[in-house]
Amino acid sequence: MEQLPSHPTNRRAKEEGNAVPLCRAKPSPSFINLQASSPPVTLLKILPTKLPSGINHKPKECLGLLECMYANLQLQTQLAQQQMAILENLQASKTQLAPGKENKNSSLPALSRNLLLSHLPQFSK
């Protein structure tokens, strides 16, 4: 019997099962108070949620989507810097192995690290 290729959503579910979870979803800082006998939409009240008193520190997990995105971009920047260091080491090794020979078909361009890093976005909190 011939096996059909797995459906993309099944494959994604398997991959997500092994993935490290990102930030857990947090409730919105405000919510709409709806009751069974609520008045028309124009009279709905939006009430802010308040944290219990005595909590002055941030929990270890992300507080919201923007914090998760910021942490993700910081990680991507760090990985890009590590990849640049690896490329620089490869380029240096290549020059040491063949001194005086310039290979025009080189797959590693001679770009400086500072030039590439200057094009990375800078984030500040």
UniProtKB/Swiss-Prot annotation:
PANTHER family: TSSK6-ACTIVATING CO-CHAPERONE PROTEIN. Co-chaperone that facilitates HSP-mediated activation of TSSK6. Interacts with HSP70. Associates with HSP90. Interacts with TSSK6; this interaction is direct and recruits TSACC to HSP90. It comes from the Eukaryota. One of its GO terms (cellular component) is cytoplasm. GO terms for molecular function: protein-folding chaperone binding. The gene is TSACC. Keywords: Chaperone. It holds the Pfam family SSTK-IP. This is TSSK6-activating co-chaperone protein. Residues 1-22 are annotated as: Disordered. The lineage of its organism: Eukaryota, Metazoa, Chordata, Craniata, Vertebrata. Belongs to the TSACC family.
